[in-house]
């Protein structure tokens, strides 16, 4: 019996592998040094950094931080042991990654985003929706609710009456459903929270000022609702009781069957109209001063503005500055 031994295989490391091994070794050494110096466990340092960047904007070339434990992200560059801003915008931190989000930039959609859009074009079995991104979003006929909440396949008759659902110029609130390789996205309105917008005022603010949170739909005092979408489109409207009630979904669908695609606004009393105007002015005041837009900031700004009973007084820059200082304290 003859036994054939398999020759040993030798792996020759390439120059890139050697460089990677050296880089990993250096990185491990740096981490060990940081641990010995107490930098890795510096939660207090992270909290202090968050406080220092809160509500702050940076300009190109401005030092963001010189703390060695932070890593640079988009909108920054490393020089002389510090992280500097390469664009004008707001500083954001994810763990120890520091980035600067530009103030003037197109909205970049992400799956699950709550957005407000405007119907730009009606095509066969789909709508093109302007959401403030580089490309229009696509809303398929199969991605909407039919009147009455009926769950069935969309027929040719539905395609023929697409303009009775949405037509050019209509505003809607939807959710980003899918992201395609070319950068375009598809959206859907298959929820009672989404659909055509009525009974309100449309505003446009820089998307960078909208702070992402778990919820972007708020109910304020005075019978006013706000939809603060992440693409920088804001809707201030009359309070919708169905949206915040605990009635069953089936009951709500039956009640909304006739009004879900209506083009007529409901009757709005004068008190609510004034509150809608006041909230709209407050949002514009925050945006014009490059202040972050959140439920808390809008509420504080609104409450501080109540010292001026006349809405015309809110348009005076001096008064707006005073309100902003009180609201952000």
Curated annotation (Swiss-Prot):
InterPro entries: Exosome_cplx_N_dom (IPR025721), Exosome_RNA_bind1/RRP40/RRP4 (IPR026699), KH_dom_type_1 (IPR004088), KH_dom_type_1_sf (IPR036612), NA-bd_OB-fold (IPR012340), RRP4_S1 (IPR048565), S1_domain (IPR003029). It holds the Pfam family RRP4_S1. It is found in: Cytoplasm; Nucleus. Its main location: cytoplasm. SUPFAM superfamilies: Eukaryotic type KH-domain (KH-domain type I) (SSF54791), Nucleic acid-binding proteins (SSF50249), Ribosomal L27 protein-like (SSF110324). Coiled coil: none annotated. Residues 110-190 form the S1 motif domain. This is Exosome complex component rrp4.
